[in-house]
Amino acid sequence: MLATTIFATLLALAAAAPHGPSHGPSVKTGDICGNGNTMHCCNDESVTNKLTGPSVLSDLDLRKLLASECSPISVNVLLNQLVPIDNKCKQQSICCGEQKQNGLVNLGCTPITVLG
């Protein structure tokens, strides 16, 4: 009975293991925006640093909500060149929801973690 249990466990583990090499480009999870979001590159943090400097607002960590001097990144550029997002942005890459982002300071965006 013990041998049957061990054999069944080993068989289940072998069936659950991935088979063969994965195909396609490798994408870090930090390089992906959710459905309906657009990717932006923000190359200046001076506005957010001034707004979140030593003050009452510094306790709120508004850097997660504010971004400055951002421009949209074309998904075609990233897919055609297979270049990670951290090679395209000097400071911070962000994902912004479906609201229009035209101003100097953009609200409602989520930073994309750049893994070194």
Curated annotation (Swiss-Prot):
Its main location: secreted. The lineage of its organism: Eukaryota, Fungi, Dikarya, Ascomycota, Pezizomycotina. One of its GO terms (cellular component) is extracellular region. InterPro entries: Hydrophobin. The keyword Secreted applies. Aerial growth, conidiation, and dispersal of filamentous fungi in the environment rely upon a capability of their secreting small amphipathic proteins called hydrophobins (HPBs) with low sequence identity. Class I can self-assemble into an outermost layer of rodlet bundles on aerial cell surfaces, conferring cellular hydrophobicity that supports fungal growth, development and dispersal; whereas Class II form highly ordered films at water-air interfaces through intermolecular interactions but contribute nothing to the rodlet structure. This is Class I hydrophobin B. The keyword Signal applies. It comes from Beauveria bassiana (strain ARSEF 2860). Residues 1-16 form the signal peptide. Disulfide bonds join 33-95, 41-89, 42-70, 96-109.
